[in-house]
Amino acid sequence: MKAAIIDGYVDEPSCLGVPPYVAPYPRYIYGMLKSLDYEATYFTIDHLRAHPETVERLKKFDLAVIIAGIAVPGKYLGGKPLSKKELFSMGLAERNLLVGPITLELSQKELRMLEDVEIEVIDFPFERKLFERLGGEKFNLNAFAARGAEVVRQHPDFPHIICEIETYRGCYWGKCSFCIERVHSLWFRSPEDVLGEVKALYDCGVRHFRLGRQTDFFSYLGEFEGVPRPNPEAMKKFHRAIWDLCPKIKTLHIDNVNPKTIAEHPEESAELIKTIVMYQTPGNVAAMGLESADERVVRKNSLAASPEEVMFAIELINRYGRHPSYNGLPYFLPGINFVIGLKGETKETFELNYRFLEEVMERNLLLRRINIRQVKIFPGTPMEKEGDRRLKKHRKEFIAFKNRVRENIDTPMLKKILPKGRRITDLRVEVEGKISYARQLATYPILVGLVGKYPRNLYVDARVVDYGHRSVTAVEADLDVNKATLEQLEFLLGKVGREVYMRRPIGSDAELEAIGGKEALVYLKVGGE
């Protein structure tokens, strides 16, 4: 029997699956389908949009499993997630099953509409239910993970992907008013099972990994009593084992860290931070949920960490991780999330949030990422009763706060993290144009506007020239002055760039400096590679 996996992408508090990130779900499902003797083929929603003929082919498939759900919406460069509107036209195969966090937000009316177009909805979390719905009897998610690794070779961007790896599921806190992680029971994968999946993916050609599918990386392998105590020795062995099995990994990063774990267990957390700096790759980010710096909002929404605990976690990660490394980025930095529209929020909340960020700046601490989003209301969460009334009430304050942060915090912070002239390595071009857009394959990579037309999937090293609010503009490193375009020279040197262009070939560094000044030697080479 023929089955299609249609990846409409997911973005959850503890899982990212929008290109270049590949969530565990397609891999689990592929392994599951193989165990049930299906001949499975993987498609991204972007591929189906671009290839109508493939959509026609799907009508001959026996089964389609559609994955979708953006629980924490963001802006995406690498792909456009499946929308609800598109979903109703996804009943393509003989039998169609919908899985993923999108099922948490479907109304009764939408469920009936899906039934009308013959799309079966499987409740989230879905893996065991899907397997049983397809007639399976011996459910083993770890076995499916390793067996399904080979599906990544069918990804349109392979090998330019980063695989999201699940270490455990659920949240030891599980009380935040808005969060969907409460739907998961705590379930832990053994180091051996995680390593087996990483090795299977590595053997398929994957070189970029994010240990991101958990709510708190620091508590993996820890003692789960109260606030989990990290186990730095076990984590060090785990990291060593990854490199022993997969010595040519290019990216090894994490995602979520609960700042409460760090604040409650500072000594163990410090040792784990050192392990991450030593055994993971630079440019790493620990995304932490501050959500609000207003103590009233913290209490009313049962948030995990106080502003003081978050500030402590930011400082501790900075202490060991802020130093720049070989790829141009600091080894390991914190990031923080703000959620707007929570219970108890007032106009003063926005001032408290901003004051928190000002204190970070005053203490000369680095934040790699400040994520500001409006709360998304899910049925079954405490925020369901509250609704979106504060979002509507504080719309102006939200926009003003976001703009203020982008202007006064993000840009100065970016200048500290990536000073002018800093070389950034291994930038993958994702969008080609007069300004080509490129990023490292990493967790929360910085967007780089690369001056010049470069083909998609080319890897380029570049030097920082200028700044946006959350991005930098750069030119190719070691750019040969005699091969550079007029646009590149004018961008670097202004009006003098045209003079340099007209007087080519330039014969020496001294001649280049005489025309363009000392700064020209930072970015341009004479006869450079």
Swiss-Prot record:
| Pfam families registered for this protein in UniProt | Radical_SAM (PF04055)
Q: Which positions are annotated as binding [4Fe-4S] cluster?
A: 171, 176, 179
Signal sequence extent = none
**Which Gene Ontology molecular function entries are recorded, alphabetically?**
4 iron, 4 sulfur cluster binding; catalytic activity; metal ion binding
The protein's required cofactor(s) are namely:
[4Fe-4S] cluster
> What are the residue boundaries of the Radical SAM core domain, all occurrences included?
157-410
Origin superkingdom: Archaea
Family annotation (CDD domains): Radical_SAM
Q: What is this protein called?
A: Uncharacterized protein AF_0243
Identify the species of origin.
Archaeoglobus fulgidus (strain ATCC 49558 / DSM 4304 / JCM 9628 / NBRC 100126 / VC-16)
